[in-house]
Curated annotation (Swiss-Prot):
Keyword match Phosphoprotein: no
Listed name of the protein: Transmembrane 9 superfamily protein C1105.08
Organism: Schizosaccharomyces pombe (strain 972 / ATCC 24843)
One cellular component term from this protein's GO annotations in UniProt: membrane
UniProt xrefs under InterPro entries: EMP70
Alphabetical keyword list: Glycoprotein, Golgi apparatus, Membrane, Signal, Transmembrane, Transmembrane helix, Vacuole
Annotated transmembrane regions: 267-287, 338-358, 365-385, 402-422, 437-457, 489-509, 520-544, 559-579, 599-619
Signal sequence, renumbered to the chain: 1-26
Disulfide pattern: none
Length: 629
């Protein structure tokens, strides 16, 4: 009997989840229903952040800045209004405000001056520095990112890159783009409704001109250079033109989702699948040939006992194979966290496959991540308690209390530190204090109670009965090959799951640090499935050879070996820094390597837990198949 109050606990769990989802998604998500505009109607235009971009394959910084940061001196509307954002948008650094640019459906505008501003020399130097680091400006028109055409594409088959350059480095100096040629594509439905299906900007640099102190559109072909050590008077202007498009509203995001490396990705996924298939084949050989033959021989009444002692090492440790590992408290907490991350990752991939998480829903990825992590506190508590009980741990109350606080507490402390670094650089990525309070409130109100409920159910669940008895006196472990030691096994075994996600890791890091849209969830779905399978296969093979060498300390080994994939992720991040990021900023380095370390640790927990679960089922299965006198 599991728990007398299971029905009431289940009802409470459902209520908790319902309230949590309502709380998380009560933040405005980007709407997915089309908006129709009659001729002359005002188009929704907003400004976002100034963000880094990978120029010539390299990035130079990772800090975002608000569009209306005083150092930019951009033109402002009469009343600046902050736009509603999802929780995920706030966490990912989006800061949306209304725009001073007025656009009306099907009305062309030829060079409209916005304003004139005086930029002091210190701010000119700041802007020059960002231009040299390939920063881009981010606008939105009808909730669609304003973009520029990617180089090397043609008019029939083109893709767009969200954002447009702040300026450009030339041989004569640094120029600032202060005129924006805005081209908006529209589509007319069968009911004569007009919809925005594309928006891009061709930024131009024009020498600023004032007439009687008022800004006017310059007819000069000279660019606007940014002087060194001097103030600058800047005039900003824009033009608007409309272009009909056959693209329906439902597919307007396809232009942003051009994948030039699609063929390479499929080839890599096929290679990863081949590796995975080979591992499955090896495990199948072990299970259906070697083990089956060994078990039949071992169970035979006519086999000589000395032959058994000689030939079948994995069966000799049957009296110790379920002996509890060292540090069961720590081990169980890490397994609970890994199960929580597995639940969260699986949910995100499934949400993306079904379109709940998509680039068109701004902030949906981060919002879903937060919601799933909070809900999966139940999974963490249950798996941690069940594992601790399996390992014959005695401090159950301590396990119940530590599970929801150890790893999440480490993550919170790291995130607060990173937030202080963002704040010191006046970056828009600084998470507001109110958002921190909300996250902590959600965690304490939902995750901690859910974790406690999961732990109670786990501790009161049916006792696990090992298929073989554990001897009172531990068996002496003989010496074995160095290749069967923990470290060499982890180095070899952890490299295989890492190779499965290597190509996808490039795209994830590019999206994380330089903000291109990440939409390749189809590839992620295959990679994630192959990763999970590979971790299980690697762990099973490692444990099998370890048991064959009569070493029964397999518990931690089954966790560390596939978990070593996280170490490779960090090593890869170091190479990514040297080959893709050219920055001498200490703050940038601290943030980059801090986030990389945090992500690598979480990958370690995820892969390690998956490997242990597979190995435990494997060990339980094979020892349940032999007869012990």
């Amino acid at each position: 009997m599991l728990l007398p109050s299971i029905p009431s606990c289940s009802f409470s769990f459902v209520v908790f989840v319902s309230v949590l989802l309502q709380t998380c998604f009560s933040f405005q998500l980007t709407p997915l229903s089309p908006k129709n505009y009659p001729p002359g109607a005002s188009i929704d235009t907003t400004v976002n952040t100034i963000s880094p971009f990978i120029g010539d394959g390299r990035g130079s910084d990772i800090f975002n800045y608000e569009y209306y940061d005083e150092r930019f001196h951009f033109c402002r509307p009469e009343n600046i209004a902050k736009q509603s954002e999802s929780l995920g948008s706030v966490l990912f650094g989006d800061r949306l405000y209304n725009s001073p640019i007025e656009i009306k459906m099907l009305e062309n505008q030829d060079c409209v001056p916005l304003c004139a501003s005086i930029i002091p020399s210190s701010d000119v130097s700041f802007i020059r520095d960002l231009i040299s680091k390939n920063y881009v400006v981010n606008w939105n028109i009808d909730n669609l990112p304003v973009a520029t055409y990617l180089e090397g594409t043609n008019s029939k088959n083109y893709s767009l890159s969200p954002g447009f350059p702040l300026g450009k480095n030339t041989e004569k100096g640094v120029i600032l783009f202060n005129h924006y040629d805005i081209v908006i594509e529209y589509h007319t439905t069968s009911s004569d409704q007009h919809r925005v299906v594309g928006a891009y900007v061709k930024p131009v640099s024009k020498e600023s001109t004032l007439v009687d102190g008022n800004p006017v559109c310059s007819s000069s072909s000279n660019p606007q250079y940014l002087p060194e050590g001097a103030d600058l008077t800047l005039v900003t202007s824009y033009s608007v033109s409309w272009k009909y498009s056959d693209t329906p509203w439902a597919t307007r995001w396809d232009k942003y989702m051009h994948i030039e490396s699609r063929q390479i990705r499929w080839i890599f996924i096929i290679h990863s699948a081949i590796i995975d298939t080979f591992l499955i084949f090896v495990v199948s050989i072990i299970l259906y040939r070697t083990l089956n033959r060994d078990i039949n021989k071992y169970n035979s009444a006519f086999v000589d006992q000395e032959d058994v002692q000689e030939d079948f090492g994995w069966k000799l440790v049957h009296g110790d194979v379920f002996r509890p590992p060292r540090r069961p408290m720590l081990f169980s907490i890490l397994l609970g966290t890994g199960a929580q991350l597995l639940f969260m990752s699986s949910g995100i991939v499934l949400f993306a496959i079904f379109g709940i998480v998509a680039p068109s829903r701004r902030g949906s990825l981060a919002t879903a991540t937060v919601a799933l992590f909070i809900i999966s506190g139940f999974v963490s508590g249950y798996v941690s308690a069940l594992s601790y009980k399996l390992m014959q741990g005695m401090l159950r109350k301590r396990n119940l209390l530590l599970t929801p606080f150890v790893v999440p507490g480490f993550m919170l402390a790291a995130a607060l530190f990173f937030n202080m670094v963002f704040w010191s650089k006046s970056s828009s990525s600084t998470v507001p204090f109110s958002s921190w309070l909300l996250l902590i409130f959600l965690y304490l109100l939902f995750t901690v109670p859910l974790s406690f409920v999961g732990s109670l159910i786990g501790f009161r669940s049916r006792e696990f009965v090992p298929p073989v008895r554990t001897n009172q006196i531990p068996r002496q472990i003989p010496s074995h090959s160095i290749w069967l030691s923990s470290f060499p096994s982890a180095i070899i075994g952890g490299s295989i799951p890492f190779l499965v996600i290597l190509i996808e890791l490039f795209s994830i890091l590019d999206s994380l640090w330089f903000h291109p849209l990440y939409f390749m969830f189809g590839f992620s779905f295959f990679c994630f499935g192959i990763l999970v399978t590979t971790c299980i296969m690697v762990s099973i093979i490692t444990v099998y050879f370890q048991l064959c060498s009569e070493n029964y300390n397999w518990w931690w080994r089954s966790f560390i070996t596939p978990g070593f994939c996280g170490i490779y992720v960090f090593i890869f991040s170091v190479f990514y820094w040297f080959f893709k990021i050219s920055s001498s900023s200490l703050a940038t380095a601290v943030l980059y390597f801090g986030y990389s370390l945090l992500i690598s640790v979480l990958v370690f927990f995820l892969c390690g837990s998956v490997g242990f679960f597979g190995a435990f089922l494997f060990v339980n299965k094979i020892y349940a198949s032999i007869k012990i006198d």
